[in-house]
């Protein structure tokens, strides 16, 4: 079976009960780190061009921006801005850190669009991030976030396995290697997040992607298929976290300090993200990012 088929089967059947606690814990920390970075970037206007473009695109009221009271925008536009906000402040030294700056904005945008529960969003983030982690280069040089983002979007849109495979295959057409350094921070991640949602929507509308697209990418990257899919569902490439030795209490305190603004609102935001698996929606989390960014 092609690599994309293996991941499509796995992702469509994945539930929160299948995910070990250490994986959920590590993902929760990455989500907290990403959102805190996005709030900080929003507060200082680090990627205002992305916000202006997203608001200009507008579209149907589907998803909100991190740290901005701009109302609801089309999900691809929101993912573009949120991807740049998270990517601009990324300080995670992990080689796969850039992938979360794509997968999470996609999951937030599509999650709000389809009114997904928190546990559904968490599963989508983990599924997309696991795919990205298995394909990523140690130095982060491969642009794999769009592939994980497409998988997360397709999962939240409840596409069947064939459409999930198509979404990832279409997203493969957006994979490209960096052409240099410099320029506006977070740009690549934001564009990848928007493209991931477009890929999933194309698949949902009947567009097809190359059935063996991931296999071709693996060959071009000199990755063995057996290595990419080995232990899928039993072994987790996304489990390791650089702050694993830090207690949750200390990690949350450090995150509150990074968030700044009202200490009460910062604590509330951390608590909401920690309880993501039990949340009825994402609305309160996005609303709190606006309050924390404004410092009110």
For the regions a protein language model found, what residue spans apply to each?
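Short coil/turn segments at secondary-structure junctions
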Residues: 14-15, 112, 183-184
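Hydrophobic alpha-helical hairpins/lids featuring a short glycine-rich hinge
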Residues: 80-135
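A generic short alpha-helical patch detector that favors 3-5-residue windows
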Residues: 2-3, 98, 120, 141
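Glycine-rich, mobile lid/loop segments that gate access to catalytic sites or pores
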Residues: 115-198, 212-213, 217-218
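Terminal-appendage/accessory-domain detector
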Residues: 1-96, 187-194, 201-296
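Alpha-helical support elements that line or immediately flank enzyme active sites
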Residues: 34-41, 96-120, 146-159, 201, ...
